């Protein structure tokens, strides 16, 4: 007996040692089922709060069901009754729901991508305060939001609020504390006192209390009997132990602190149900019909072992033979865990029951098809290919080819695939291809094709690509050429050294650029669509006409000139003379234009100089002498005569 008492005292000393994380004190505790919840006040970050719970053997609290949310609300209500009035009207208390840095929001899940720090399976229960922000760049933590201006009612459970997790010294806005959770194998009933006394429980998570509804396994109880007189005080020490599977008690027999002075009048003698007094002041505990007295001689238990609901979660209690024992049974899709009291989900997808994709769900599973497949109908396979190229469904601009589980797009000749998803078609500009223009002279790009053309005085060869010198006439043709002229025109050839090879400019217009002539394309030149209608060169040489444009066609080979050798020589001489005559007319026209320009320029210079002289003359400054003029000079004798000659008829 002394050895047992020594071990109990040693256990009490170990349990009462102060733990790490003393930045917050346990203010309230609620134990129910197989878990205890503790509420703490203190402005700590989420990491500091988790460290405090963890060093005492627990984690920040989980809230996986409405029932568990009510337990957490009860312990917070106890804390608020003991705590002084908080300054903030809206207060927050950390719980164990967090999302790590780099993990993004998932709106399709009840927990939105968050997870419980204590582990375990996610449940569909959630109680978010508002829509969450999609942020992946920092760690986010969840707290319970309490409106202290309103009473805590079971119908108004605390909302979940997510935000930054805080740091030491800066826990976050309105953070007032946190809630811890500690899980146990089972619970003992509170010790019953049959007389005056006090019981103090010390839990494994270093909480002391005298008013626990259930006492967790491995807790110690210190019972002090008496009414306060030290001479009459007696102490008893007990430990909550597991007597049998899922059976926990203190190992005591009968009520504690019993006194003949009170009998059954004090706390019903400490009996669970009935108390029967003897004639000498003693009493005994009894049970009602359908119940039996347990070994502690105080507690009553139903004769039906399932009446105490030993099975947890979704497990159902099933009586054994003669009703003396029981087993727990799980619904379909679940199986018993290692304790044989609770149920866990069966992962049916491990057996690969689906043709393609299997998604495990609580209590079951569902089959899904890969992208590009859809569920088949009756009599068809589980998943069948989706024909993306079907009428009205094709995503391609032109050609669409369906494949098993996918598709690919194609374009007609003259187009290439374009767009981010490769479903659009873009025209190929053959006139600016990497190999240079396909035409010898002018090139015109069209949607899906191109056309070739020639400068005035040149005609498109039968291959639709090269240009040959056209016939030259001194005057406009009087009528359509006869068959012989046509033959000569088609058969004439002109050797080319360095000619102007026009190509398409950046605006899509033909642009002539000097290039070295090259031989005409062979008979395997590309064949293009219908030619663009344009006027053939006609009229006097040296005058610009609309280029002769034809579409490139396949030529059967080099054409033989009609007639014999003499015909070929004649045609060559005619072509040379025509070319010289054309050059003569061009040079003459250029010289005439230059002479006219020189004459106009000389006339313009002359008129400008004359205008300047007149303007200078008009602006010449005047002086005083300009107002006088010289008198005509007379002979001196004539003047003397006029002055001294006597007047006629006088002596003077």
From Swiss-Prot:
Q: Does the keyword Transmembrane apply?
A: yes
List the PROSITE patterns hit by this protein, alphabetically: ASX_HYDROXYL, C_TYPE_LECTIN_2, EGF_2, EGF_3, EGF_CA
Q: Which residues lie on this side of the membrane: Extracellular?
A: 24-580
What gene does the UniProt entry assign to this protein?
Answer: CD93
* InterPro entries the UniProt entry points to: C-type_lectin-like, C-type_lectin-like/link_sf, C-type_lectin_domain, cEGF, CTDL_fold, EGF-like_Ca-bd_dom, EGF-like_dom, EGF-type_Asp/Asn_hydroxyl_site
Q: Which domain of life is it from?
A: Eukaryota
Q: How is it modified after translation?
A: N- and O-glycosylated. Phosphorylated on Tyr-628 and Tyr-644 by SRC; these phosphorylations promote endothelial cell adhesion and migration.
How does the record describe its quaternary structure? Homodimer. Interacts with C1QBP; the association may represent a cell surface C1q receptor. Interacts with surfactant protein A/SFTPA1. Interacts with multimerin-2/MMRN2. Interacts with DAG1; this interaction plays an important role in endothelial cell migration. Interacts with CBL. Interacts with IGFBP7. Interacts with VEGFR2.
Query: Bias category Polar residues: which stretches?
Result: 512-526, 640-652
What is the name listed in the Swiss-Prot or TrEMBL entry for this protein? Answer: Complement component C1q receptor
The organism named in the record is Homo sapiens
Q: Name one GO cellular component term.
A: ficolin-1-rich granule membrane
Going by the UniProt annotation, this protein carries glycans at 325
Q: Indicate the secretion signal residues.
A: 1-21
Q: Could you list this entry's UniProt keywords, alphabetically sorted.
A: Cell adhesion, Cell membrane, Disulfide bond, EGF-like domain, Glycoprotein, Host-virus interaction, Lectin, Membrane, Phosphoprotein, Receptor, Repeat, Signal, Transmembrane, Transmembrane helix
């Amino acid at each position: 007996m002394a050895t047992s008492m020594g071990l109990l005292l040693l256990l009490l000393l170990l349990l009462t040692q102060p733990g790490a994380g003393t930045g917050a004190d346990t203010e309230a505790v609620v134990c129910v089922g197989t878990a205890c919840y503790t509420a703490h006040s203190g402005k700590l970050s989420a990491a500091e709060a988790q460290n405090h719970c963890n060093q005492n053997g627990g984690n920040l609290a989980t809230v996986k069901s409405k029932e568990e949310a009510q337990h957490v609300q009860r312990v917070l209500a106890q804390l608020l009754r003991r705590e002084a009035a908080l300054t903030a009207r809206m207060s927050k208390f950390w719980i164990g729901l967090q999302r790590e840095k780099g993990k993004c929001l998932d709106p399709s899940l009840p927990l939105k991508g968050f997870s419980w720090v204590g582990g375990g399976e996610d449940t569909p229960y959630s109680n978010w305060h508002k829509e969450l922000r999609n942020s992946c760049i920092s760690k986010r933590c969840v707290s319970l939001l309490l409106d202290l201006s309103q009473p805590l009612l079971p119908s108004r459970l605390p909302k979940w609020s997510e935000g930054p997790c805080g740091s030491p010294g800066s826990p976050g806005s309105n953070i007032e504390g946190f809630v811890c959770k500690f899980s146990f194998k089972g619970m003992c009933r509170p010790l019953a006192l049959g007389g005056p006394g006090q019981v103090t429980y010390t839990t494994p998570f270093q909480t002391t209390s005298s008013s626990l509804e259930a006492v967790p396994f491995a807790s110690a109880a210190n019972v002090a009997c008496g009414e306060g007189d030290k001479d009459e005080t007696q102490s008893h020490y007990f430990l909550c132990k597991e007597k049998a599977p899922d059976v926990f008690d203190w190992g005591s027999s009968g009520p504690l602190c019993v006194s003949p002075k009170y009998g059954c009048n004090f706390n019903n003698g400490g009996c669970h149900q009935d108390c029967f007094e003897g004639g000498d002041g003693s009493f005994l505990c009894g049970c009602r019909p359908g119940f039996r007295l347990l070994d502690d001689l105080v507690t009553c238990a139903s004769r039906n072992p399932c009446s105490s609901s030993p099975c947890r979660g979704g497990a159902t209690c099933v009586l054994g033979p003669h009703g003396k024992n029981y087993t727990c049974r799980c619904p379909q899709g679940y199986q018993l865990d290692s304790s044989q009291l609770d149920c866990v989900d069966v992962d049916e997808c491990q057996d690969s029951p689906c043709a393609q994709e299997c998604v495990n769900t609580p209590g079951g599973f569902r089959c899904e098809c890969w992208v590009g497949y859809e569920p088949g109908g009756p009599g068809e396979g589980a998943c069948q290919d989706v024909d993306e190229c079907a009428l009205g469904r094709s995503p391609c601009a032109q050609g669409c080819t369906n494949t098993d589980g996918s598709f690919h797009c194609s374009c007609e000749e003259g187009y290439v695939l374009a767009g981010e998803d490769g479903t659009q078609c873009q025209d190929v500009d053959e006139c600016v291809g990497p190999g240079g223009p396909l035409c010898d002279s002018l090139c015109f790009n069209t949607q899906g094709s191109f056309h070739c053309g020639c400068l005035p005085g040149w005609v498109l060869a039968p291959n639709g690509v090269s240009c040959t010198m056209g016939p030259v006439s001194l005057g406009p043709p009087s009528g359509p050429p006869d068959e012989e002229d046509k033959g000569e025109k088609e058969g004439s050839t002109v050797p080319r050294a360095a000619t102007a090879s026009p190509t398409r400019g950046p605006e899509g217009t033909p642009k002539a650029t000097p290039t070295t002539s090259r031989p005409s394309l062979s008979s395997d030149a590309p064949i293009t669509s219908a030619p663009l209608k344009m006027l053939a060169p006609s009229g006097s040489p040296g005058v610009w006409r609309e280029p002769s444009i034809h579409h490139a066609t396949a030529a059967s080979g080099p054409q033989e000139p009609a007639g014999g050798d003499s015909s070929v020589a004649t045609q060559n001489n005619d072509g040379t003379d025509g070319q010289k005559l054309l050059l003569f007319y061009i040079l003459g026209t250029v010289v005439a234009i230059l002479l006219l320009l020189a004459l106009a320029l000389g006339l313009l210079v002359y008129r400008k100089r004359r205008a300047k002289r007149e303007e200078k003359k008009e602006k010449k400054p005047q002086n005083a002498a300009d107002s006088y003029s010289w008198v005509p000079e007379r002979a001196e004798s004539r003047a003397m005569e006029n002055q001294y000659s006597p007047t006629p008829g006088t002596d003077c």
